[in-house]
């Protein structure tokens, strides 16, 4: 199911009693540092990363929890499990604290279901230095779901996924070059491009 996380409004007080500083302090000094709480909740949330991989990029090792809704802008959700996502250091560093703007918020890795959608486009380009891969959000999606297209573009841009995927793909291509050369001879260029 889809949650409209981008509809949440920024705020500085929680129930008119706790300030954003109070909520940030609860997270920083209790949730992360008190061993009993850390072992029970923080470590459990970290274990939700499938195979230990970051659910944002699918490449890096999940090593920290990130607030999908920034705790400094949305303090009510500072210790809400739905708001805490295990991520790699690169994705955590790339995302800054920002207000979620409807129709252009990045994807929430657990609540925005896109696995069944063919949204990622990969293109192999031959250059002087070799074959490089470029990734983008499929233009076909823009025709069928403009909002999802914009959110996916924001997601790719925010987390620098084109670069991350290009590096990963180039590494994979280089490591498997003998295999691809063999397939090129067997199938020909036209059939190989269809993959």
Please provide the spans of the model-predicted regions.
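Generic hydrophobic, helix-prone segments enriched in Leu/Val/Ile
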Residues: 1-2, 27, 120, 148-155
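Short Cys/His-rich Zn2+-coordinating modules
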Residues: 31-44, 66-73
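Glycine- and acidic-residue-rich phosphate-binding/metal-coordinating active-site segment common to enzymes
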Residues: 61-141
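C-terminal, charged low-complexity interaction regions
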Residues: 146-195
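Short cysteine-rich loop/turn motifs with clustered Cys
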Residues: 42-64, 88
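Non-cleavable N-terminal signal-anchor transmembrane helices
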Residues: 1-5, 133-135, 139, 143, ...
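N-terminal accessory alpha/beta regions
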Residues: 1-36
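Residues that form generic nucleotide/phosphate-binding pockets
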Residues: 26, 30, 44, 183
